């Protein structure tokens, strides 16, 4: 059983810069073999700012800074109040989009919003490896190769090792499909993963 409260806001302070956020909290009753627990659960509530700037008629610079917040916990124990989510700078044009920073991998993005329980205790991340958000990240998304089909490629470089993730994504009308590949070792390279994402 769960009661979910979701509140979103977006405040446009300039033609190409937006402040936004979402509070997503559920009241959950969890019955397990060890105990029965009723508690408020934060489901990736967040705040952020994003914007874009036209460098030319065919070239755009964009950015996003996004942090997870937990309205159910005042963090009196000294834990971080904010947890970094997708935070990056990107340049896009006829060639596609090139971006760097902290971001979901191509494999993670290949969900294509089919995870109906995303951000909750029943998130697909608990049964499927590859729900990774990495820093030291460089990503590329191609323009459509054919109608509705593009490629996403990204890589990371860290002191613990390197990794790559790639996906073919198809989206047209009501049909969506994706084929993604990511080494299992990516999970061990993982630099950051939010509690529910």
Regions found by a protein language model. Name each.
Residues 156, 182-184:
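Active-site beta-loop-alpha junctions enriched in small/polar residues
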Residues 8-10:
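N-terminal signal peptide c-region/cleavage motif recognized by signal peptidases
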Residues 163:
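Conserved adenosyl
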Residues 187-194:
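Conserved small/polar residues in nucleotide/adenosyl-binding loops
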Residues 16-28, 36-160, 168-176:
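Outer membrane beta-barrel
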């Amino acid at each position: 059983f769960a009661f979910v409260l979701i509140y979103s806001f977006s405040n446009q302070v300039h033609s190409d810069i937006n402040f936004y956020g979402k509070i997503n909290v559920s009241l959950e009753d969890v019955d397990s073999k060890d105990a029965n627990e009723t508690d408020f659960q934060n489901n990736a509530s967040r705040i952020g700012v994003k914007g874009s700037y036209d460098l030319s008629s065919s070239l755009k610079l964009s950015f996003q800074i996004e942090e997870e917040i937990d309205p159910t916990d005042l963090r009196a124990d000294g834990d971080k109040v904010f947890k970094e989510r997708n935070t990056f700078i990107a340049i896009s044009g006829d060639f596609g989009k090139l971006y760097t920073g902290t971001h979901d991998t191509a494999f993670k993005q290949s969900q294509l919003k089919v995870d109906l329980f995303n951000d909750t205790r029943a998130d697909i991340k608990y049964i499927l490896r590859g729900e990774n958000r990495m820093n030291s990240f460089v990503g590329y998304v191609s323009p459509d190769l054919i109608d509705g089909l593009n490629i996403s490629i990204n890589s990371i470089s860290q002191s613990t090792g390197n990794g790559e993730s790639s996906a073919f994504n198809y989206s047209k009308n009501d049909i969506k499909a994706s084929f993604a590949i990511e080494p299992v070792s990516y999970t061990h390279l993982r630099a950051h993963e939010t509690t529910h994402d």
